[in-house]
A protein has these predicted regions:
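Short, flexible loop segments at boundaries between secondary-structure elements
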Residues: 118-124, 183-187
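Generic alpha-helical structural context detector
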Residues: 121-124, 139, 162-165
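Acidic, divalent-metal-coordinating active-site segment for phosphoryl/phosphodiester hydrolysis
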Residues: 152-167
Length: 225
């Protein structure tokens, strides 16, 4: 079983080293590159203000987040959901930095960079020089964006799961892996018995008729020098 976890965060800003915090985290389980329906989602009280420019991106204000769990309250569940899976994110370095900062505040181990799969890097390799934001990729792959009014970690995970499948080979990739299993009936065809091949040879009359037809041909190609 190939298990990956695709995840996304929303934050109060762009730099955890300047005190920006995670306000939302969502994760979605993939097995053989297809969603299983299992997911993790939490809104988080950042224990600080939410700048207006950040609110314009994700729609959350400090009032929305007051009383929500603190990151310390959800960290254990998130780590358990991640387990030892490969971790997929769009512009993954950004999300890794923020989670590492949150884990570091709690004295927890940071994420192993070797587990990172960055869909932005995959997209840039496949579509060099083209826009490769999540919105741009959804439009390129004809993925419905009608519900994406603001950035929302859980919805973005669901959209990114569809984008990821397209980036690694399209909807059929993983489908075969998911549908063929131990219970799938397999038909095996074997040859039954032996078969004698009949060789048909022309009779004297048929040979004579064929020769007569050849003599009526004008300038046959095989007679040319």
């Amino acid at each position: 079983m190939n298990r990956c976890v695709l995840f996304d965060t929303e934050t109060t800003g762009l730099d955890p080293e300047l005190g920006d915090r995670v306000i939302e985290v969502a994760a979605l389980e993939l097995v053989n590159d297809l969603p299983t329906g299992r997911h993790f989602h939490a809104l988080v009280d950042p224990e600080r203000d939410v700048p207006e420019e950040a609110t314009r991106i994700h729609g959350f204000t400090a009032a929305h987040l007051t009383g929500k769990p603190k990151f310390a309250d959800i960290a254990g569940g998130l780590v358990e959901f991640f387990a030892d899976a490969r971790l997929i994110a769009h512009n993954a370095a950004f999300d890794f930095r923020f989670l590492d900062a949150e884990f570091g505040r709690l004295g927890r181990a940071v994420l192993d960079q070797a587990r990172m799969i960055d869909t932005l890097a995959l997209a840039k390799k496949r579509f060099p020089g083209m826009p490769n934001s999540l919105d741009a990729l959804c439009r390129r792959f004809a993925i419905d964006l009608s519900q994406r009014k603001t950035h929302n970690a859980l919805l973005d995970c669901q959209l990114l799961a569809k984008v990821y499948v397209e980036l690694i080979g399209g909807r059929q990739h993983g489908l075969v892996l998911a549908t063929i299993g131990p219970s799938t009936p397999i038909e095996i065809y074997t040859r039954v018995g032996s078969r004698t091949i009949r060789v048909l040879t022309p009779g004297a009359a048929e040979i004579a008729a064929h020769q007569a037809m050849l003599t009526r041909l004008r300038d046959p190609i095989w007679a040319m020098d």
